[in-house]
């Protein structure tokens, strides 16, 4: 399980029990997040980019002697597992992409420009809460907003700036991912109210032969939190069918 920016492995708390009944489960805290925060300065001095952070994940698999995995990601975590497909496709059995970020629309591009212009001057929690509200504006998205805000509070401003800097590197990478199918079984699980990212995923799935899409009713961006039963059943059935 690969979480998004500002989160931690704890965002999968509604998945762990269900998935452990079927699979061996590995939860990873990305550099600077969760329990990886304490060792950050000692081990993660290389540049922040999607390739290096994805290599962190592969290093964990190597350490645990895991040759192949089914990967489940949420939000920015989906970009990382898609990057792993490029770096080490033989390590990937299938992908479950929740709240996937596959292309930026005009609104999200404006947010990226605004955030990068102000990230060193405005307290990062102001920015984080603003972005969370824009991406997840509805009342039923409140649990997701609160969960991510509580996790983001554990980051320091310096760490937030490093991660936000990744947004500048997203466009060419996402363009490449859109133009190149992985040829691996890929399931996208998207909330029907994920207005910033769902249209782009719908277009991508039409062009990628091995991709499929499940749209979760009454649900926003963080579908594993807002509709966990739907997410769990759909993902488990998909992974089982490709095991």
Language-model features: locations:
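The conserved beta1-alpha1 loop
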Residues: 2-4, 190
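Serine-hydrolase catalytic-loop signature spanning alpha/beta hydrolases and amidase-signature enzymes
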Residues: 4-14, 25
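Active-site loop/oxyanion-hole signature of alpha/beta-hydrolase fold enzymes
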Residues: 14-17, 26-72, 233
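Gly/Ala-rich beta-loop-alpha elbow adjacent to hydrolase catalytic centers
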Residues: 73-77, 81
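Flexible "cap/lid" loop of the alpha/beta hydrolase fold
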Residues: 86-87, 92-122
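Conserved alpha/beta-hydrolase catalytic His-Asp/Glu region
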Residues: 106-108, 125-180
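Conserved loop-alpha-helix segment in the C-terminal half of the alpha/beta-hydrolase fold
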Residues: 185-219, 225
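Post-His helix in hydrolase/transferase enzymes
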Residues: 225-237
């Amino acid at each position: 399980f690969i979480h998004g920016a500002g989160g931690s492995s704890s965002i999968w708390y509604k998945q762990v029990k269900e998935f452990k009944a079927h699979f061996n489960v590995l939860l990873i805290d990305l550099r600077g997040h969760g329990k990886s925060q304490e060792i950050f300065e000692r081990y993660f001095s290389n540049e922040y980019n999607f390739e290096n952070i994805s290599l962190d994940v592969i290093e964990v698999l190597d350490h645990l002697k895991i040759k192949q995995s089914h990967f489940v990601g949420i939000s920015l975590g989906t970009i990382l597992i898609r990057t792993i497909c490029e770096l080490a496709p033989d390590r990937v059995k299938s992908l479950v992409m929740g709240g996937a970020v596959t292309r930026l629309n005009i609104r999200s591009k404006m947010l990226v420009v605004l955030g990068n212009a102000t990230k060193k001057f405005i307290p990062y929690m102001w920015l984080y809460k603003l972005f969370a509200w824009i991406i997840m504006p509805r009342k039923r998205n409140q649990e997701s907003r609160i969960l991510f805000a509580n996790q983001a509070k554990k980051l320091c401003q310096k760490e937030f700036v490093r991660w936000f800097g990744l947004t500048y590197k997203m466009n060419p990478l996402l363009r490449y991912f859109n133009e190149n199918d992985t040829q691996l079984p890929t399931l996208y699980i998207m909330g029907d109210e994920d207005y910033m990212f769902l249209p782009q995923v719908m277009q991508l799935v039409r062009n990628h032969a091995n991709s499929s899409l499940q749209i979760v009713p009454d649900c926003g961006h963080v579908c594993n939190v807002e509709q966990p039963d739907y997410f769990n059943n759909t993902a488990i059935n998909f992974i089982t069918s490709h095991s």
